[in-house]
Amino acid sequence: YSGYRHARADLYAGQPMVLVPPEIYDPDIILWAEEALSPAAFGSFSITTAAKHDQIIAYTSQLAHVVSSAFIKSPTAQKHRGFSAGSYKDLTRVAELNADMWTELFMDNADNLTEEIGVVITELERYRDALSRGDEAELHALLEQGSIAKRKADGRYSDAREGGVR
């Protein structure tokens, strides 16, 4: 879904806007940009460096596309109809992509994306190994760690032993 025919007034409402100015920039230009972009009703407005942008985008966007593309290649994907619901839809939404565009984006950010793929491979191996060994305690610990990591990443982690939200 791209191009003018899919445009709508609220397309960016509530979404983050990240500006990556040159190393030396005029704060007045940033203020001008915030004002010029305000009709789009972005949910947040951030300023960052190119290096940090590329690192975070490798994780938040590009990795999701790689994982989705890899996941859908399972032979089981061709047999899913009638069995799948929200989880399948969530994980495969971005698998149908523009290969030309994403190849270029991935190659331009290969170092960051390769690092993130390595993290996922390591974690998947931990799950596979726990399952192969029949190690229920390890599997439970891995799942709990993932749940905690999600809450921490979203800024809503609470640990009663520590007395509140972290």
Question: How should these model regions be labeled?
Answer:
Residues 154-166:
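Long, positively charged, glycine-interspersed low-complexity recognition regions
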Residues 11-17, 40-62, 78:
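Conserved Rossmann-fold dehydrogenase catalytic segment
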Residues 24, 52, 98:
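Residue-level detector of flexible, active-site-proximal loop/helix-junction positions
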Residues 44, 56-93:
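Substrate/ligand-engaging "lid" and interaction regions
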Residues 79-149:
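Interdomain hinge/lid region at the active-site interface
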Residues 1-45:
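Rossmann-fold dinucleotide-binding core
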Residues 35, 148-151:
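Charged/polar positions on well-ordered alpha helices
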